[in-house]
Amino acid sequence: MTTALWGGKVGQRSNKSEYLPSMPIGCWLLSRIRAERRMNKYLCVIWLSVLGIVSVCGDNHTDTDSLSALFNVDEVQVTARALSKDIIIPQTLRGVELQRLNSLSVADALRYFSGVQLKDYGGVGGIKTINVRSMGSQHTAVYYNGIQIGNAQNGQVDLGRFSLDNMEQIALYNGQKSDIWQPAREFGSAGNVYLTTRKPYFRECEKVHVRAQMRAGSFALANPAVGVDVRLAEGVSMTLDAEYVYSNGKYPFRYKRVLPDGQVAYDTTAVRQNGDINAVRAEAGLHHYYSNTGFWRFHLYNYYSERGVPGAIVNNVWRNGERLWDRNTFAQVQWQDEFFGRWSVRALLKYANDYTHYINYDERLLPADNQYLQQEIYLSVAQKVMLFRWWDMSLAYDFQYNHLHREDLILESREEFFHRYSHWLSLASAWNVQDYLRLQASVLMTQVDKEAPRVTPGVFLSLRPWQRIDLSINAFYKQSYRYPTFNDLYYTDMGNANLRPELARQHSVELAYRLQKKRVQNLLLSVSYYYNRVSDKIIAYPKGQQFRWTMLNLGVVKINGLDTKADMSLSLPMRFVLRLRLNYTYQTAIDVTNPSDTYYRHQIPYIPWHSGSAVAGLDYGSKRGDHYGLNYSFIYVGERYGQQENTVFNYVQPWYTHDLSLYGEWNIVQRHTLKLTLEVNNLFGQDYEVIQNYPMPKQNFRCTIAYRY
């Protein structure tokens, strides 16, 4: 159950009617069908008629964002669907949890999720992408306020460009969301990351909110940001956000290499060069909630950056000749409503325009001066009908057009155009037998250009044996399909026109337990085992330059993994609150394509066997409303290999970091607050590399002062 902006109830159902009588399941189902048959006849006719129109027209688009986390304005509180109601329990960071982390961007925060591997090239401006459960970055879709962020060029999203300053929640789902009312395209990803920006909410007497902050730190970091929320009318509001980021990226590091016989080959201390960044982000949003179930939302986003691309350090040779300019702009509209209390419709529309300019000045490498212009149009519509109180069905259709213009400014005659038409059609059903058994099934048809359509199914189950004990057994099986990107197929010195599509099969079983008591505000324990099999897996790894990659089909990869998570909030005497968050992952991801290969059954590149994180926070709230907190975080990534062959030459050492932060927040005047945060990252100054030959910063500091009204 969720709460609308004005306190109305969205999607409320009677709990009494959900309990099974003491009769056989078959008799119970028959009685429920007879009781509601008349009521549902006209709904089914209307729904199927509209679905037929949708299938013919095809000009549709779906929204991933829902009313599952809205605001009660009068009480100024956030309500969200209980975790125990989800078949797939997401990993989430929201609100105060995000502020507590020593994180500058979304990529930094995602490191604290289990089963996630982050590719980070160092510094504020280094490109950052994620890999979930070793499936590959292209199998992980990123959604911004409910609509996927596309990149037909390379299929990867640089998460370093998304700030945490205006972020309300980050959620990671393995498989897919538990709600079948979603865009068809969402059923086709192995994992989904949902980024939700702050929505404005006001007390009855409030009309304007203002946020302003300044962050400064090591490596000449300067990061001012400002935000304004305006209440235009009842249920109508506008948001404006802007941010600037600068850093020279010059941080000290130690480069050391030891030969297999133990002799030191290189041991150098130097300062990282060409890691500077100048970036500007501006966003505007318009929100209109016109009923308890209906709203529309418009969002405009623009990001521009100029950065150096710090090169790899190989055999004590520095490469610092690469520069990168990015501009990412998109406008998106979302609308959804509910009719007759049972039929729900959601539609989305998006236009994106992305520009990239890449230059390589390094004389030791081939010169490069390339421009890329991408355009994307995305349409979707999704419908859901409640056939019975225990049975929902949904149908969704998505269409996307991508166009890429590539121009080589060195070779004037080298100009290329690529385009792609993609269609997704999904049918899903959800059954809820009391709160004991939840079952979902979906089937997705994907067609890209003139390729033959590919059908991928998914089945999800959640069993809760005891009503009074919040213990659930969750499992799913899913297939997902990924077509090679433009870079995979055509990019010079990297592309491979003979690449075959990937097909992934996921199996997962999870045991989850949740407890809420007076002192234990929230306790969540979960253990997940998963087995994934990827056919014709496409692997990308650096080839001396982080902007260029080498692409190849590995054939078959088998992935086995175990994720464990623990999350707890504990109320202590004297107004203290202790928060703990622990994650651990063990996984093997091996190439089993050809027994004659030298890397047969070797761990694939950059997948550690062991990884984990820990976050602890102690908060204190005074009687006058001031807040103070001390936060500690720890991240560990075990040994791994940087190439296909697991040899001593390709070995990448494990690394770990300790981060510490201290904050104070004061009410200086009524509704005016001032917050000061001090951070120390990599507390003990460890030398480490996330990507081989790309050294990371040692100990560094940040200070943030923020004002809110």
Please place each PLM-identified region on the residue numbering.
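Conserved C-terminal beta-signal and adjacent last beta-strands/turns
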Residues: 276, 287-289, 471-476, 507-509, ...
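Transmembrane beta-strands of outer-membrane beta-barrel pores
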Residues: 197, 214-220, 244-248, 290, ...
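N-terminal periplasmic "start-of-domain" segments of outer-membrane beta-barrel proteins
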Residues: 70-101
